[in-house]
């Protein structure tokens, strides 16, 4: 491989790029940027591709700029949207920017000498831009005809809801971002998802018209799933990078559960593994799909990258708990997260004080057993587990000593029939 573009090609991450970009990257190290929309107080897994694109360029010796959209976030990007988005308050956008800046920082190297990463906020220049300056310095150079020809605008113009002037102007603001970074930081390249191509080329055109110089664009494909459903969404919503919004366990499980048809592509997109390593994992999947070897490697690589080694270890311990693994090292929060979807009952903590409650009564109250005699037979048959530890004693009583952090107890019948007791 001679340039970063060769790596992006074999990973399937080069959807479209400006003419001459290969030659530019062979000649020199460049500064590039990708913008991040602060529409929430956390990035989600859909942002991993742009984050890793910046990181991959940096590993090839280029200088990445992660641009938080503190200014453009006040407007809202219409690209890929079928209707107008509600405007966020200035205070909410500012708070979101601060939150995502911390996440952006963990993927890039800010102490890499002459190609150290930069973290900028376009509110610094957009909020100082007067309406008169905007119309003279930006609006004058891009015609309405040019803007209407862009897919992001044309598709909205054809819809019932149309597009407001506010969102229509977003393209000009993003173009100004590129021109500003070109002038002040020598940034020659903007990257983004394929739905950003129209906005990126508008910036290239603005730079050409205002400075007579050439800038470049590059877009990667939007992430898709083989079954046609939206990537990055689960039944409970988006998969966030913030562990408070999506626990490392559920983050790990998302990647572990990807389809065989997608796992090879995602290994290329979201990990640093080599082509040879990925091809070997794909061959194992083809021969023995039930082992889920590739999915496990994908889950390990991405969880470690986002949450760290310690969180990965806990996520794997938690994953084993569903298959009878030990709960000894897990917290009550971990257990509640793992067993969120299993049947549960709530009991007063005082019911387990002192001698507590008989295991037989607990099994009946949970519904694991239909009667006391049914519970007795299950215990005597060795099929009952307390916190994944087998209990064959029909005289066993549940007390607070059995609880995890005084908050919950996990009962199990057989291999997979779980029930959670929550204590209040």
From Swiss-Prot:
L-tyrosine binds at residues 33, 170, 174. One of its GO terms (cellular component) is cytosol. A motif ('KMSKS' region) lies at residues 230-234. A motif ('HIGH' region) lies at residues 38-47. The keyword Zinc does not apply. Its EC number is 6.1.1.1. Keywords: Aminoacyl-tRNA synthetase, ATP-binding, Cytoplasm, Ligase, Nucleotide-binding, Protein biosynthesis, RNA-binding. InterPro entries: aa-tRNA-synth_I_CS, aa-tRNA-synth_Ic, Rossmann-like_a/b/a_fold, S4_RNA-bd_sf, SYY-like_C, Tyr-tRNA-ligase, Tyr-tRNA-ligase_bac-type, Tyr-tRNA-ligase_bac_1. GO terms for biological process: tyrosyl-tRNA aminoacylation. It is an enzyme of class 6 (ligase). The keyword RNA-binding applies. SUPFAM superfamilies: Alpha-L RNA-binding motif, Nucleotidylyl transferase. GO terms for molecular function: ATP binding; RNA binding; tyrosine-tRNA ligase activity. It catalyses: tRNA(Tyr) + L-tyrosine + ATP = L-tyrosyl-tRNA(Tyr) + AMP + diphosphate + H(+). It is found in: Cytoplasm. Disulfide bonds: none annotated. Residues 357-424 form the S4 RNA-binding domain. ATP binds at residue 233. Catalyzes the attachment of tyrosine to tRNA(Tyr) in a two-step reaction: tyrosine is first activated by ATP to form Tyr-AMP and then transferred to the acceptor end of tRNA(Tyr). Homodimer. Belongs to the class-I aminoacyl-tRNA synthetase family. TyrS type 1 subfamily. This is Tyrosine--tRNA ligase.
């Amino acid at each position: 491989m001679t340039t970063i573009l060769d790596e992006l090609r074999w990973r399937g991450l080069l959807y479209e790029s400006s003419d001459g970009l290969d030659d530019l990257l062979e000649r020199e190290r460049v500064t590039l940027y990708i913008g991040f929309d602060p529409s929430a107080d956390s990035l989600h897994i859909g942002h991993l591709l742009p984050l890793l694109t910046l990181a991959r360029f940096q590993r090839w010796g280029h200088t990445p700029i992660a641009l938080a959209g503190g200014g453009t976030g006040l407007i809202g990007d219409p690209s890929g949207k079928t209707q107008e988005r509600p405007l966020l308050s200035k205070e909410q956008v500012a708070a979101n920017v601060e939150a995502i800046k911390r996440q952006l920082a963990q993927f890039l190297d800010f102490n890499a000498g002459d190609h150290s990463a930069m973290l900028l906020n376009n509110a610094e220049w957009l909020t100082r831009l007067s309406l008169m300056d905007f119309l003279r310095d930006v609006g004058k150079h891009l015609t309405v005809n040019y803007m209407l020809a862009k897919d992001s605008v044309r598709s909205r113009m054809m819809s019932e809801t149309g597009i407001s002037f506010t969102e229509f102007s977003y393209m000009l603001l993003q173009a100004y971002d590129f021109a500003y970074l070109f002038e002040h930081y020598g940034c020659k390249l903007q990257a983004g998802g394929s739905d950003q191509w129209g906005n990126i080329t508008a910036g290239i055109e603005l730079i050409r018209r205002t400075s007579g110089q050439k800038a470049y664009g590059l877009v990667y494909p939007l992430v898709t799933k083989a079954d046609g459903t939206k990537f990055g969404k689960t039944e409970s919503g988006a998969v966030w990078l913030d562990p408070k919004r999506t626990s490392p366990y559920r983050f790990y499980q998302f990647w572990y559960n990807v389809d065989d048809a997608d796992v090879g592509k995602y290994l290329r997109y979201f990990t640093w593994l080599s082509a040879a390593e990925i091809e070997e994992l794909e061959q194992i999947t083809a021969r023995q799909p039930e082992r889920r070897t590739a999915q496990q490697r994908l889950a390990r690589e991405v969880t470690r990258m986002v949450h760290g080694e310690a969180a990965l270890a806990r996520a794997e311990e938690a994953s084993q708990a569903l298959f009878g693994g030990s709960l000894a090292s897990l917290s009550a929060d971990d257990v509640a997260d793992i067993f969120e979807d299993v049947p549960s009952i709530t009991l007063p903590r005082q019911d387990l004080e002192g001698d507590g409650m008989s295991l037989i009564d607990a099994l009946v109250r949970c519904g694991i057993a239909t009667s006391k005699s049914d519970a007795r037979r299950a215990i005597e048959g060795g099929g009952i587990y307390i916190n994944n530890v087998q209990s064959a004693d029909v005289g066993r009583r549940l007390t607070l000593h059995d609880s995890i952090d005084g908050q919950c107890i996990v009962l199990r019948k057989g291999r997979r029939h779980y029930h959670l007791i929550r204590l209040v």
